[in-house]
């Protein structure tokens, strides 16, 4: 009886030794950067300069994490929001905006309040809007 159990344990251990490295190797190939990156010109737009319909859309979604695009005849607006934050002092950094592999990539980071920075205990909704010439590619957000 003990031999049967020990034999099953050995089989399971050998299977794990084979399966684990295979799983680990395939996990590394997940998110690949495009080979042909091309920078895209953009402008960070203030709320006052947005189309009214886009302002309303942002206002209705600001309390949740938001990734959206809005296109007019001439421009594409790319909107990213990080939802509700309990204090002031947050900003959004644009790391890169580029095209590659038939997509527009938007690489952003949320920057929290600096250590020791005075903050107000008030709900804030960090949102950034990037305006660029009209684009047809799908958008990939890296947030």
Language-model features: where?
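Exposed, flexible binding/inhibitory loops of compact, secreted disulfide-stabilized domains
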Residues: 2-16, 21-143
């Amino acid at each position: 009886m003990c031999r049967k159990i020990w034999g099953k344990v050995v089989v399971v251990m050998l299977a794990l030794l084979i399966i684990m490295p295979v799983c680990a190797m395939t996990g590394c190939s997940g998110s690949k950067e495009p080979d042909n990156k091309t920078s895209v010109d953009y402008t960070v737009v203030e709320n006052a300069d947005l189309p009214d319909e886009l302002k309303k859309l942002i206002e209705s979604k600001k309390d949740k994490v938001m990734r959206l695009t809005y296109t007019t005849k001439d421009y594409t607006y790319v909107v990213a929001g990080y939802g509700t934050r309990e204090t002031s002092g947050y900003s959004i950094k644009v790391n890169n905006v580029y095209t590659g592999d038939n997509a527009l990539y938007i690489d952003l980071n949320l920057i929290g309040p600096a250590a020791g920075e005075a903050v107000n205990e008030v709900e804030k909704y960090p949102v950034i809007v990037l305006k660029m010439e009209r684009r047809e590619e799908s958008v990939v957000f890296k947030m």
